[in-house]
Amino acid sequence: MAGRSEPQDDARLLQAVKIIKILYQSNPYPSPEGTRKARRNRRRRWRARQKQISEISGRVLATYLGRPPKPGDLELPELDKLSLQCVETTQDVGTSNTSQPQTATGETVPAGGNYSILGKGAKN
């Protein structure tokens, strides 16, 4: 199962999945009966229980499989290496562009600003 060779790992995984399934089945979605306030309160309590079940499920997986449910810390690049430049733009910030703007297909847009949302060939 899932590329493992040891049957005891598979049995442990199946046991963990069965426990998690029972947890989620024990908390069905609330019924749509009653006043708006009562329904809202039932949904709020249901979401709180779902959150608890999710946390318990993570602990069950960690216990049965021997690994944490979330990956470790990610290494992020240094802040000075990050930029907000557009990949398509080759022009530096602060320089003026005297040529006419182009569309994604490479066509130039007239200076009057006839920007068509529908594109070429579409009837307005």
From Swiss-Prot:
Q: Name one GO biological process term.
A: mRNA transport
UniProt motif (Nuclear export signal and binding to XPO1) ranges: 74-85
Q: Which InterPro entries match?
A: REV_protein (IPR000625)
Q: Where is this region: Homomultimerization?
A: 19-27
Q: Kindly name one Pfam family recorded for this protein.
A: REV
Please indicate the residue ranges that the annotation assigns to the motif Nuclear localization signal and RNA-binding (RRE). 35-51
Polar residues composition bias: residue spans: 90-106
Task: Give the record's subunit note.
Answer: Homomultimer; when bound to the RRE. Multimeric assembly is essential for activity and may involve XPO1. Binds to human KPNB1, XPO1, TNPO1, RANBP5 and IPO7. Interacts with the viral Integrase. Interacts with human KHDRBS1. Interacts with human NAP1; this interaction decreases Rev multimerization and stimulates its activity. Interacts with human DEAD-box helicases DDX3 and DDX24; these interactions may serve for viral RNA export to the cytoplasm and packaging, respectively.
Additional free-text comment from the UniProt record? HIV-1 lineages are divided in three main groups, M (for Major), O (for Outlier), and N (for New, or Non-M, Non-O). The vast majority of strains found worldwide belong to the group M. Group O seems to be endemic to and largely confined to Cameroon and neighboring countries in West Central Africa, where these viruses represent a small minority of HIV-1 strains. The group N is represented by a limited number of isolates from Cameroonian persons. The group M is further subdivided in 9 clades or subtypes (A to D, F to H, J and K).
The family classification in the record reads: Belongs to the HIV-1 REV protein family.
Q: What is this protein called?
A: Protein Rev
Q: What is the phylogenetic placement of the source species in the record?
A: Viruses, Riboviria, Pararnavirae, Artverviricota, Revtraviricetes
The primary gene name is: rev
